[in-house]
């Protein structure tokens, strides 16, 4: 019999209950006990939804991040949060965001907050994790209380499950040394703690543990490969079965290593690594389980169940009970329930599967494999009809878009002149001081803004009323910026619910869910639009709002657009053509918007490519192809403008050292980047690469409520000036200010502007 299991379930709740519960707690509007009760309620609901599985995941729920959870389980807390009184949950939030609940920190020893842990992308996804911190003297100590609590809850519900933990080698790989030490040297100290954790679970009667080592789908040098051998040789002696889980890609040259590790089962991503399954069957010892991720855990399209059975059936016959099936990865990366989508176009809806529907697909596959296809004939027929409907739909294919794509030539992405000739023209037109100040784009999405938007969408507020409300918010943003003394202004994006969804709503080829939320980090959720067909722009999308904002001030007003690569990487993308083709379609559509903004007199246009790096394949050997079309798509979007129009781009959560040449090749006049959490370490890339254009290294972390001091900002910018000529430096926050409150934004920007004025006097 084939065994079914799941690697992880979305933790936020179908209606984002966790998000709202966290935010209530942080604001002091609810108690710690209420938050913990909400967590227990969500876990129970999610386990009940997975009752049909042979093994449900236990320990996949987190109040913020599963990597941070592992740091606490291993006793690896940064020294700056040690010694505070109160519940462990409050220290947990201090690491995550610099503060815990408002009421806790106001009466505790850290009312000024602490530095939040560094946050970066989880492999090539749009989820973010808190980076573990290591020192030469780091010690580990086991605290399994959270995992044991969840195990007890699951058992009380009668749930058959397996605890899920992050593997020791991936845990070290994901972290960062805070001194000159080598984090891999900590493995001998770490392994006994993992061994003790497995012993604890054994004592609880646990049979299987899922231990995640996704680094096996990356390029590993000899040291890291040996670390995996060492780790699992040490853990082999434990009296518990280990399912080693990999996901997000192919094993490649790590296949033999993965198959040889002394574990009891191996999970592989059969969406990306289907071609490796036969080799794994040959290489795995005859007593090992092979778990295949046959359902795409990262996208929302229905699985072609009949085609999947065509290749699973011979495998089941060959492996028998040794075959397990599951989604390719944790379902954290997809929304919870398609049944909530009552307003979604019925035809498009018929093509989709969210987390609960993916579990239904898994059940159909298992029934067909265990009892024959006849047992699920109706379900298979309905699935085949949906797959065929999508394949044949004229809504997916637009001949005019394909014709425009065919007309792209090598000149379309080139500026008329090089940066050295453009810069003086832009300087003359903009007349900016040294160390010019700006923000990244968005200002706080207040309750009034959200209320007006919801009223408008519900039909309770007419278009004129909505426009007036948004114009009032734009005017507020402009007046605040003028009062602060910022040099290049933004309109604040009051009218935008999301930097990707806003554009997708106005592009043909996109559809939108009501409740298709996925977690980005902590309480931050995003609702990726659904790119289902060929993309085109029926009309201008931003010109009216930007020109209104410009009419309110004599200072330069930035046009704000999201770039094609980011729109692509932050969407659920059609899987019936190469991603590059969809990206070029987006580039042509956004290019039209850029040119319309320029015609309207907009002097500075920002095209955000926050997600450029996260689209990189996990294996460096495949980077070249991706960067070629990604950079070309940006250039097509941006480079049709005149020399005196200044193009900005923004990138966040990016390590730039290894792609700095490609970033330079984008040829944006100004790039703004996230650097503050890394204390300007990201600028190390510029030690060996002379970046030719202007740059704004982010000087304060907008993801934390902490207010940066003027001296701190001056210090960061002086570090930047050691690497980049002062005349090419801008001063700006790390990212947009949408998620902050005005009460936090005003003092932070006040200090930022004051720091810029100090720098103009101190730095020549």
From Swiss-Prot:
Its EC number(s): 2.1.1.14
SUPFAM superfamilies, alphabetized: UROD/MetE-like (SSF51726)
Cofactor: Zn(2+)
UniProt pathway annotation: Amino-acid biosynthesis; L-methionine biosynthesis via de novo pathway; L-methionine from L-homocysteine (MetE route): step 1/1
CDD domains noted in UniProt: CIMS_C_terminal_like (cd03311), CIMS_N_terminal_like (cd03312)
One Pfam family in the UniProt entry: Meth_synt_2
Cofactor binding notes: Binds 1 zinc ion per subunit.
Active site: 703 (proton donor)
Residues reported to bind Zn(2+): 650, 652, 674, 735
Binding site for L-methionine: 440-442, 493, 608
The entry's keywords: Amino-acid biosynthesis, Metal-binding, Methionine biosynthesis, Methyltransferase, Repeat, Transferase, Zinc
Catalysed reaction equations from the record: 5-methyltetrahydropteroyltri-L-glutamate + L-homocysteine = tetrahydropteroyltri-L-glutamate + L-methionine
Residues noted as binding L-homocysteine in the record, renumbered to the chain: 440-442, 493, 608
Keyword Metal-binding recorded: yes
HAMAP family per the UniProt record, alphabetical: Meth_synth
Functional summary from the UniProt entry: Catalyzes the transfer of a methyl group from 5-methyltetrahydrofolate to homocysteine resulting in methionine formation.
Protein name: 5-methyltetrahydropteroyltriglutamate--homocysteine methyltransferase
Gene behind this protein: metE
């Amino acid at each position: 019999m084939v065994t079914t299991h799941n690697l992880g379930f979305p933790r936020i709740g179908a209606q984002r209950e966790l998000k709202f519960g966290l935010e209530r707690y942080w604001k002091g509007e609810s108690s710690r006990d209420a938050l913990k009760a909400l967590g227990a309620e969500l876990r129970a609901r999610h386990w009940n939804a997975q009752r049909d599985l042979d093994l449900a995941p236990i320990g996949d729920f987190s109040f913020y991040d599963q990597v941070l959870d592992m740091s606490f389980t291993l006793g690896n807390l940064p020294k700056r949060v040690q010694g505070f009184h109160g519940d462990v949950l409050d220290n947990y939030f201090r690491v995550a965001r610099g503060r815990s609940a408002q009421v806790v920190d106001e009466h505790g020893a850290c009312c000024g907050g602490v530095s939040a842990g560094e946050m970066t992308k989880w492999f090539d996804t749009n989820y973010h994790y808190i980076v573990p911190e290591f020192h030469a003297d780091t010690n580990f100590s086991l605290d399994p209380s959270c995992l044991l609590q969840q195990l007890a809850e699951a058992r009380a519900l009668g749930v058959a499950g397996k605890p899920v933990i992050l593997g020791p080698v991936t845990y070290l790989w994901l972290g960062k040394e805070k001194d000159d030490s080598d984090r891999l040297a900590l493995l001998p100290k770490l392994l006994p703690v993992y061994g003790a954790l497995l012993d604890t679970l054994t004592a609880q009667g646990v049979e299987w543990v899922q231990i995640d080592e996704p680094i096996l789908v990356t390029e590993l040098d000899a040291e890291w490969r040996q670390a995996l051998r060492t780790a699992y040789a040490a853990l082999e002696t434990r009296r518990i079965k280990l399912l080693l889980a990999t996901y997000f890609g192919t094993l490649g040259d790590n296949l033999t290593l993965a198959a040889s590790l002394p574990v009891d089962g191996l999970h592989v991503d059969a969406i990306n690594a289907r071609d490796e399954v036969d080799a794994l069957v040959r290489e795995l010892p005859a007593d090992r389980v092979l778990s295949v991720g046959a359902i795409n855990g990262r996208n929302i399209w229905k699985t072609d169940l009949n085609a999947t059975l065509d290749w699973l059936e011979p495998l089941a016959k060959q492996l028998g009970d040794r075959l397990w099936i599951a989604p390719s990865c944790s379902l954290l990366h997809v929304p919870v329930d398609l049944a909530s989508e009552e307003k979604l176009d019925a035809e498009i809806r018929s093509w989709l599967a969210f987390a609960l529907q993916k579990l239904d697909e898994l059940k159909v596959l298992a029934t067909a494999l265990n009892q024959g296809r006849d047992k699920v004939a109706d379900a298979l027929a309905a699935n085949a009809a949906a797959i065929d409907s999508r394949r044949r739909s004229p809504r997916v294919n637009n001949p005019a878009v394909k014709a425009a794509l065919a007309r792209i030539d090598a000149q379309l992405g080139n500026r008329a002149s090089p940066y050295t000739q453009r810069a003086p023209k832009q300087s003359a037109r903009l007349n900016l001081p040294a160390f010019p100040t700006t923000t990244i784009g968005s200002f706080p999405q207040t309750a009034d803004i959200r209320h007006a938007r919801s009223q408008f969408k519900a039909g309770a507020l007419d278009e004129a009323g909505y426009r007036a409300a948004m114009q009032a918010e734009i005017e507020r943003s402009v007046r605040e910026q003028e009062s602060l003394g910022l040099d290049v202004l933004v309109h604040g994006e009051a009218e935008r619910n999301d930097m990707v969804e806003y554009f997708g709503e106005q592009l043909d080829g996109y559809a939108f869910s009501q409740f298709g939320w996925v977690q980005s980090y902590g309480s931050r959720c995003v609702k990726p639009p659904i790119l289902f067909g060929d993309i085109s722009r029926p009309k201008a999308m931003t010109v009216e709002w930007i020109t209104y904002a410009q009419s309110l001030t004599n200072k330069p007003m930035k046009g704000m657009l999201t770039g094609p690569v980011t729109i692509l990487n932050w969407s659920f993308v059609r899987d019936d053509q190469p991603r590059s083709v969809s990206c070029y379609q987006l580039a042509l559509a956004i290019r039209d918007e850029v040119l319309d903004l320029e015609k309207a007199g907009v002097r500075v246009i920002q095209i955000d490519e926050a997600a450029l790096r996260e689209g990189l394949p996990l294996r460096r050997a495949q980077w070249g192809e991706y960067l070629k079309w990604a950079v070309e798509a940006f250039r097509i979007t941006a480079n049709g403008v005149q020399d005196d129009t200044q193009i900005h781009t923004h990138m966040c959560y990016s390590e730039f050292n290894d792609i700095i040449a490609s970033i330079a090749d984008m040829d944006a006049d100004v790039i703004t980047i996230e650097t503050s959490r890394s204390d300007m370490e990201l600028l190390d890339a510029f030690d060996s690469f002379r970046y030719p254009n202007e740059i704004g290294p982010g000087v304060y972390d907008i993801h934390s409520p902490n207010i940066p001091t003027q001296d701190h900002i001056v210090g960061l910018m002086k570090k930047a000036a050691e690497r980049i000529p002062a005349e090419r430096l801008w001063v700006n926050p790390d990212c947009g200010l949408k998620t902050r409150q005005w009460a936090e934004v005003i003092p932070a920007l006040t200090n930022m502007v004051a720091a810029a004025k100090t720098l103009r006097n101190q730095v020549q």
